């Protein structure tokens, strides 16, 4: 598996991947996180246009997972019910989704984020997830992230927030 920047040619595959992820979440006790059809096609296209959407592809360059990686400070992380280990610059992983074809997806994403962080001289990676997203919470903990507290999205929805200090 390889990770590359998504392009407009990947939009149909991205729609398929996010639909599969919504089904998986609903079937695993998390029907509300993306239950409203988010991220929308327009949100996905915008992330692709920004160059922040990445895809994991197989040997035929077919995307099977997607995520976004940002180097700018996330405004929703400015206030936390808890505490971040530090206030140093960080990368943020968002919108992790998979069609469940490939295995080791989150480990590959974290390895990729670590490489990007090292290249940018950034010493932390942050991620958040819904309280009902137990599979993701397990993967986050397994990858070595520390639970830091609760943040709130722009719409007020709470998310469990984690940081990996590199």
Predicted regions and their residues:
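A short beta-loop-alpha structural element at the N-terminal edge
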Residues: 2-16
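Conserved GNAT-fold acetyl-CoA-binding loop/helix
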Residues: 22-42
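Conserved beta-hairpin
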Residues: 50-67
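Conserved acyl-donor/pantetheine-binding loop and adjacent beta-alpha core of acyl/acetyltransferases
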Residues: 67-101
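Conserved beta-strand-loop-alpha-helix junction that forms the acyl-donor binding cleft
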Residues: 101, 127-137, 155
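Conserved acetyl-CoA-binding loop-helix of GNAT-fold acetyltransferases
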Residues: 103-115, 138-142
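Conserved GNAT acetyl-CoA-binding A-motif
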Residues: 117-129
């Amino acid at each position: 598996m390889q990770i590359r920047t998504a392009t407009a040619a990947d939009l149909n595959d991205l729609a398929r991947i996010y639909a599969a992820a919504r089904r998986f979440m609903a079937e695993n006790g998390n029907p509300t996180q993306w239950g409203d059809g988010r991220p929308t096609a327009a949100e996905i296209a915008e992330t692709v246009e920004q160059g922040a959407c990445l895809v994991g592809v197989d040997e035929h360059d077919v995307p099977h997972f997607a995520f976004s990686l940002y180097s700018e400070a996330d405004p929703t992380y400015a206030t936390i019910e808890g505490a971040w280990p530090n206030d140093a610059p960080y990368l943020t992983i968002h919108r992790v989704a998979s069609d469940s074809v490939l295995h080791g997806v989150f480990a590959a994403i974290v390895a990729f984020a670590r490489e990007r962080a090292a290249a940018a001289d950034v010493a932390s990676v942050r991620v958040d997830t819904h309280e009902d997203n137990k599979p993701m919470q397990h993967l986050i903990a397994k990858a070595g992230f520390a639970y830091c507290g609760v943040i709130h999205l722009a719409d007020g929805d709470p998310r469990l927030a984690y940081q990996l200090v590199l």
